[in-house]
Design a protein with these regions (language model features):
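Surface-exposed binding/hinge segments that line
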Residues: 133-190
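N-terminal lobe/hinge region of extracytoplasmic solute-binding protein
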Residues: 40-90, 121, 204
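Ligand-site clamp/hinge motif
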Residues: 217-218, 223-266
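Gly/Pro-rich hinge or "lid" segments in bacterial periplasmic/extracellular proteins
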Residues: 168-234
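Periplasmic-binding protein-like
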Residues: 286-337, 369, 451-460
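Aromatic- and charge-enriched surface segment that lines or borders ligand/interaction sites
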Residues: 85-135, 292
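Extracytoplasmic/peripheral linker and loop segments enriched in polar/acidic and small residues
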Residues: 311, 383-395, 409, 418-477, ...
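A structural "hinge/loop" feature
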Residues: 41-62, 82, 109, 175-185, ...
Length: 493
């Protein structure tokens, strides 16, 4: 009998051991089904310290794990975040941000005004000037950046009674809007974010989520909420949106940003798509130096507008026609639109060429538009379209650009930042237009006069505004973007 005891005991122990694994796996499966959101992204960056090379989807990671003094919703309303109240002086130069007393880091310690000031000092030292315009508008900030003064003595960012007090060099109506951008979200020990893959477990987080795992192909975020809803979000590197969508269709992804165009109608019919306007616009420069008359430029614009109109009839989820407006918001100005429509319909003699050429940056938007334009011209005119899609350094060759009849320009059509918007066109303007644009005297009237001129000359004309599309699974009942085009992780339910 004794000779059987040892084998029987071993079988019992091994069986109990395996049952333990089965139980653990069941728990893991339940959690995966109920609590985990899988978000497909095209790449995962190691460096989250500076913004020079981050895409909008890379920025989403920072938005998930950190909060700013203020935020901006999809309707461009400025909302409190770390600051519970904002007080602006009568002259518009000084701002007081009263920090909420009930906000905490991911380790449970309280977030204070001193934390914000330390972060702003680090941000001024570590990030590139082009990414921190809002802070460089602060009195003394540029001198500190250039090493001419200390932060404590020279920069007008101070702490008082758990408030952050900021004084600008001059009134800036865009200051709060700029401050909502992801780069100004509070990050502890900023230098450690340069290798966040290595340091993710050493830093603490000010946002709705914290990073709990960082691998080459996946980042795991866990909710900081204490309400019992410990939601987990996996950001999974799928290399391209087609791979994300394939995984979405078999239930392995719950969020896909801008799924393939061919899938949009099906997703919409299934109730699995949110479509929102975004600032990305496409504009057409028509080269007046290539012997194309005013009437020729007018006809080209008319033809290309018709090609976009035909295309939009089956792709209304992807974009909205500009219809003569440089900003989406201006489409409500019916008088202006009617005037521009009348101008566009003038007819004069023009002898069209056999071939027209288009140059543009090589991206998915431009590839699709060039294909559509080429096809429409072949079917509706006697003009052939030849186009070139080039990488950034090749595209920026000014001598090369002069040899093309048209150039597609992708621009951020943010009506709150007209200066940045119009300066994107500066290389395509006359010397007198450049002088106006590069002066410090631009206001809304100046921009409007400039806009009317380049439209009436058919030099730079608006074509379309793109939409943001989000595919989401049945696991999600609510999801939103913020006013900067980033994912609002606090909205996910």
């Amino acid at each position: 009998m004794k000779k059987y005891l040892l084998p029987i005991s071993l079988i019992f122990i091994i069986g109990a051991f395996l049952l333990g694994f089965i139980q653990i796996d069941n728990v893991s499966s339940d959690k995966k089904g109920d609590d985990v959101i899988n978000y497909g992204v095209e790449d995962i960056p190691d460096n989250l310290k500076t913004f020079a090379n981050l895409s909008k989807r890379n920025e989403d990671i920072i938005c998930a794990v950190s909060r700013g003094l203020v935020s901006k919703d999809i309707d461009n309303n400025i909302l409190p975040s770390l600051a519970k109240e904002i007080i602006k002086s009568e002259d518009g130069i000084e701002y007081e941000f009263k920090i909420d007393d009930n906000i905490y880091w991911s380790d449970g310690s309280k977030i204070t005004s001193d934390d914000v000031i330390v972060f702003f000092r680090e941000l001024l030292k570590e990030d590139d000037e082009e990414n921190i315009h809002a802070l460089l508008d602060v009195y003394g900030a540029r001198e500190f950046k250039d090493g001419k003064t200390t932060f404590e003595k020279g920069v007008a960012i101070k702490s008082k009674d758990n408030s952050v007090i900021i004084r600008l060099n001059a009134k800036n109506d865009k200051f709060l809007s700029e401050l909502t951008k992801p780069q100004y979200r509070l990050r502890k020990y900023l230098v450690m974010w340069e290798n966040i893959k290595k340091n993710y477990n050493e830093v603490i987080y000010s946002g709705d989520y914290k990073i709990t795992s960082f691998m080459n192909d996946k980042i795991t975020l866990e909710s900081n909420s204490n309400d019992g809803n410990r939601r987990v979000i996996n950001l999974i590197n799928d290399s391209n949106v087609e791979l994300s969508m394939a995984s979405f269709e078999i239930g392995e992804r719950d969020i896909v940003i801008n799924p393939p165009q061919s899938q949009l109608n099906k997703l919409s019919n299934d109730g699995s798509l949110i479509t929102m306007p975004k600032d990305t616009g496409v504009y057409l420069y028509i080269n007046d130096k290539n012997n194309i008359s005013l009437q020729g430029r007018r006809e080209i614009y008319k033809y290309i507008s018709e090609s976009m109109e035909d295309y939009s009839s089956s792709n209304e989820k992807s974009f909205e026609l500009a219809e003569g407006s440089y900003f989406r918001e201006n489409k409500e100005d019916l008088t202006k639109l009617q005037t521009r429509k009348v101008i566009s319909n003038k007819e004069e003699v023009w002898s069209p060429p056999k071939v027209l050429t288009i140059l543009c940056r090589d991206n998915s938007i431009n590839r699709e538009l060039c294909r559509v334009i080429e096809k429409w011209f072949a079917e509706n005119t006697d003009i052939s379209i030849k186009y070139s899609l080039l990488k950034e350094d090749e595209f920026n060759d000014e001598e090369l650009q002069k040899r093309y009849d048209m150039i597609l320009i992708n621009n951020e059509a943010n009506i709150l930042d007209k200066d940045k918007f119009y300066k994107k066109f500066v290389n395509y303007m006359s010397d007198s237009e450049k002088e106006i644009l590069l002066s410090n005297n631009c206001n809304d009237d100046v921009y409007l006069n400039l806009e009317n001129k380049i439209f009436e000359e058919y030099k730079i004309v608006p074509l379309i505004f793109y939409n943001e599309n989000i595919a989401y699974s049945k696991k999600i009942s609510n999801i939103k973007m913020d006013g900067n085009g980033n994912m609002d992780f606090s909205s996910i339910k």
